[in-house]
Amino acid sequence: ASLGLAQLSHEATPALAQLGFSSLFFYAMAALPYRRHGPAWAAAIGLIGLTLSGAPTLALLFGLGSAVLHFADRESVGSDTTRKSHIVQEAIAIALLSLGTTVLALSLGLLRWKVEWPEATWSEWNGFVQLLVWFTWPAWPLALWTLWRWRRQLFNRRISRHIALPAWFALMCTGATLVSPSSDRTLLLALPALSTLAAFALPTLKRQVAALID
């Protein structure tokens, strides 16, 4: 839960569909190392739905980034060459699916760049920071704490999927928010990833702090 979700969850807009489809794809990538068929269908539905609901660029970025992270995670299976081969095939399939949704968006005229670069003024950047602070509260402090406590696992030769995957989703949504005219609705898609990062902070907190949060 966050303040931003509380504000927008009652509105019947494409942003809620985008939130649902992006969450479905996020689940697919998190579950793919443990299951195959269910996450495969979830990934396809998530990316196609995200594209058709008006966010084809984010669908492409989510898909390609996830494919790279999934490919980099092949070392986690050790010497299991069969599983490594499956991971490589899955990563290629995700990348091709991402490119396929982009072709679909182009054919339907959905891929329209609506980039509005922020002005180099204090009021512009102050408004962006304020949006990040209140919209994602209370997830963002815990998410930052997670990135700090797990920084060695994040910046390591061996990928830590449980940190890198939500960090990628949150980073892409935050960057898209910066150049999007509907910034709050774009930032809405970062909430599942930020909530995931925030959850990993709880085991590192003292018992009194965790009890206070509960």
Place the predicted regions along the sequence by residue.
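Membrane-helix interface segments
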Residues: 35-40
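Specific aromatic-rich, kink-prone transmembrane helix
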Residues: 18-34, 46, 193-197
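Short amphipathic alpha-helical leader/targeting segments
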Residues: 23, 203-204
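Generic secondary-structure signature for well-ordered alpha-helical cores
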Residues: 6, 14, 28-34, 134, ...
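Terminal, non-globular segments
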Residues: 1, 33, 94-97
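Multi-pass, polyprenyl lipid-linked donor-dependent membrane glycosyltransferases
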Residues: 1, 7-24
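Transmembrane-lumen/periplasm boundary regions of multi-pass, lipid-linked membrane glycan transferases
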Residues: 12, 44-186, 190-192, 196, ...
